[in-house]
Amino acid sequence: MTINFVPVKKGAIMLLTGAKEHLFFICNDPVFYPALTKECFLAVNLTTIYRDIAYDDTCILGIGDHPFVKHDSYILYKKAEVLGVDTVTSQVMAGDIRVSEPCRNDVFDRILNGFNVSPHVKPKIRKFYNKYCR
């Protein structure tokens, strides 16, 4: 099966992190990123809220915000990462990464605004965000 995939702003992909798949939102259209010398994009993931575990409440998504969301979840800004287009595309083609429904505009705006608010955004991620995602 051939899947044509190009990462685009507001897109979403399912990546295996640890033992579970997590939804990652694509924060920008691919750009040449000199630090990695290739086309890249910023991705940030969504993870479940467990009431007995501390979490970043900067951006909470609930049922209705995205088809994947089945219960309250939060954007895990501290684990946002810059991903290479070539790597992700080849993993999608191999079936190791699944493509999910894109993000609605209003939800996407909330996610992006969180990069300016969350105290957990790493400096290199904030720099990438400010240069390529705004």
PLM feature segments, named:
Residues 5, 18-21, 37, 71, ...:
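Alpha-helix initiation and capping sites
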Residues 1-7:
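Mixed-charge, Lys/Arg-rich low-complexity intrinsically disordered regions
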Residues 15-66:
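Compact nucleic-acid interaction/catalytic patches
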Residues 4, 57, 91-92:
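General secondary-structure edge motif
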Residues 10-11:
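Loop/turn positions that initiate beta-strands
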Residues 65-134:
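C-terminal terminal-subdomain/extension
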